[in-house]
């Protein structure tokens, strides 16, 4: 089965942001009410059910519907007004919030800056060494303020520390027993909280 592909030139992406307004017959700064009113009028005129003999009516109706969908969505409309259909394509690929970043990074000065920094750092070799090897194999690592010998504790000292901690705990006997807890026990005390640190 052969596929019939027309030999039409594919539409190019505009950057002016006027084609959708021209489809609806409006100027670029048209209000939402004007867009809705014009859309209803053109949709009724070019609807495929009202024009069964016209094969181009369905295509025209699709264009009108697409223009209405984009121009009534404020986010897409702002992108279209600023960057044209190329901006809508970028928004579809990378998200609405990344359109400005894409066009900023694809500008001539951003590309030039990228090339200059690449040349100055030896094709980013210095940046790679700094990140991967911490600036020439650790010469820039911070030194510890305390020497490592202070961290060693002999077993005898550790045993002595444990015995003194136990002896201190014996000086304060447990006086109160915990209250019985059940499902109805409140987790928060009923008395008002006091944030005073003075006893």
UniProtKB/Swiss-Prot annotation:
Chain ranges of the J domain: 19-84
Q: Which UniProt keywords apply?
A: Chaperone, Lipoprotein, Membrane, Palmitate, Phosphoprotein
Relate the assembly described in the record: Interacts with the chaperone complex consisting of HSC70 and SGTA.
Q: Which residues carry this modification: Phosphoserine?
A: 14, 16
Q: Which organism is it from?
A: Bos taurus
- State the encoding gene: DNAJC5B
Q: How does it sit in the membrane?
A: Lipid-anchor
Q: Where in the cell is it found?
A: Membrane
Q: What is this protein called?
A: DnaJ homolog subfamily C member 5B
């Amino acid at each position: 089965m052969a596929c019939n592909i027309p030999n039409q030139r594919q539409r190019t992406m505009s950057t002016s942001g006027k084609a959708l307004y021209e489809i609806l017959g409006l100027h670029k700064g048209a209000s939402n009410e004007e867009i809705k009113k014009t859309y209803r009028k053109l949709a009724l005129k070019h609807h495929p059910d009202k024009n069964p003999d016209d094969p181009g009516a369905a295509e025209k109706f699709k264009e009108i519907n697409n223009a209405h969908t984009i121009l009534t969505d404020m986010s897409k409309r702002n992108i279209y007004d600023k960057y044209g259909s190329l901006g809508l394509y970028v928004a579809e690929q990378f998200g609405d919030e990344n359109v400005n970043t894409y066009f900023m990074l694809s500008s001539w000065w951003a590309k030039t800056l990228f090339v200059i920094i690449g040349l100055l750092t030896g094709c980013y070799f210095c940046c790679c060494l700094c990140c991967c090897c911490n600036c020439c194999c650790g010469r820039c690592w911070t030194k510890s303020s305390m020497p490592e010998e202070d961290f060693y504790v002999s077993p005898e000292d550790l045993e002595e520390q444990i015995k003194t901690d136990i002896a201190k705990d014996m000086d304060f006997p447990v006086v109160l027993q915990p209250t019985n807890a059940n499902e109805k026990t409140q987790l928060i005390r009923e008395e008002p909280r006091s944030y005073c640190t003075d006893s």
